[in-house]
Amino acid sequence: MKVKMLSRNPDNYVRETKLDIQRVPRNYDPTLHPFEVPREYVRALNATKLERVFAKPFLASLDGHRDGVNCLAKHPKSLASVLSGACDGEVKIWNLTKRKCIRTIQAHEGFVRGMCTRFCGTSFFTVGDDKTVKQWKMDGPGYGEEEEPLYTVLGKTVYTGIDHHWKDPVFATCGQQVDIWDEQRTSPVCSMNWGFDSISSVKFNPVETFLLGSCASDRNIVLYDMRQATPLKKVILEMRTNTICWNPMEAFNFTAANEDYNLYTFDMRALDTPVMVHMDHVSAVLDVDYSPTGKEFVSASFDKSIRIFPVDKSRSREVYHTKRMQHVMCVKWTSDSKYIMCGSDEMNIRLWKANASEKLGVLTSREKAANDYNQKLKEKFQYHPHVKRIARHRHLPKSIYSQIQEQRVMKEARRRKEMNRRKHSKPGSVPIVSERKKHVVAVVK
């Protein structure tokens, strides 16, 4: 008689150790799982709710300045070090790990208008209202030595900004004009200007390092080529631009922080139309900085908040504020893309998480898998009304909330007025102008 025996491979169902997870046989035939999509929807809804529950972005407040914080600079080689300059001429170097000030320098008389670090991280530069450019050692003075700059350059006019080249021992300052300096010389290698108004900010391109951009008080954004020592072209906007920041991953793109409450992302090859207009702030935007990934940027505003924008979206994905935080003057995104620092005029530097609900520290493999799965579910169901409503909801201060409502009413009134004018005018006499083209006055080459 023939007997058929059942044989199973124990490797398919037996755990190697008792600490392993039990292996569960699964059949992925969709006919056996008729409620797969409703189950995923519930999981996406729960994941979105939990994201808002665990959204605790504020990490620390670094206090020690005796006047408002006017500028920040990152250390190019160390994630733990950050430099800050105040309105009383004081520069502090902070250790973010210990959340303590490790060094204080009385650098200038009056405001510290700008500061930048050398690309190798051995020294940093500051400019102030006392018409001087100073270079300082990143490491403190030795025992018995006095705190003195490596060298000092006395200029003829007040310098309002400074930035260092990403590869060469060259830096640029701005004021009445844009000056290019060699570190070994006490006079500018070349000077460039276009117009007669003062220039408030200058920034080197991190990819095409010979390019730099500046913004002037006559509403211009001017681009320069350091090889030709001449301006390339400029774009004139309706209102003044406070600062610009280049995208670290896309060589031709930069974002401008404007006085008209908006930010504009431009492609320098086609300046007549912005790539994107970023709208959400309710007061002048004072500073902007990109994440190292180039996918997002953070903006600081006079409305006492900071916002995180995706590069390709016109609305912010996150807004950070506290009860004590006043006008935010400067903001930086750390080099590991995990944290954001902002300095405000009530003398504090605040440290935030870039992702408000992110768990800090080392994650287990199961936690990583669960996070990835939840993220995919939220992306899949992001346009469903309940998921979208929960994900977008933010608590705002009363001042910002009321200003948002006021701006909404004003925008609707302008739109209605334009429609009525078009309705009662000759066809074609009142053209339809897109939001992106409204704010650009002219491009000059």
UniProtKB/Swiss-Prot annotation:
GO MF assignments: nuclear estrogen receptor binding; ubiquitin-like ligase-substrate adaptor activity
GO-annotated cellular components: cell junction; centrosome; Cul4-RING E3 ubiquitin ligase complex; cytosol; nucleolus; nucleoplasm; ribonucleoprotein complex
Intervals holding WD repeats: 64-104, 107-146, 149-191, 194-234, 236-276, 280-319, 323-362
Gene3D superfamilies: YVTN repeat-like/Quinoprotein amine dehydrogenase (2.130.10.10)
Main location: nucleus
Quaternary structure note: Component of the DCX(DCAF13) E3 ubiquitin ligase complex, at least composed of CUL4 (CUL4A or CUL4B), DDB1, DCAF13 and RBX1. Interacts (via WD40 domain) with DDB1. Interacts with ESR1 and LATS1.
Family the UniProt entry places it in: Belongs to the WD repeat DCAF13/WDSOF1 family.
Role summary: Part of the small subunit (SSU) processome, first precursor of the small eukaryotic ribosomal subunit. During the assembly of the SSU processome in the nucleolus, many ribosome biogenesis factors, an RNA chaperone and ribosomal proteins associate with the nascent pre-rRNA and work in concert to generate RNA folding, modifications, rearrangements and cleavage as well as targeted degradation of pre-ribosomal RNA by the RNA exosome. Participates in the 18S rRNA processing in growing oocytes, being essential for oocyte nonsurrounded nucleolus (NSN) to surrounded nucleolus (SN) transition.
Protein name: DDB1- and CUL4-associated factor 13
The organism of origin for this protein: Mus musculus
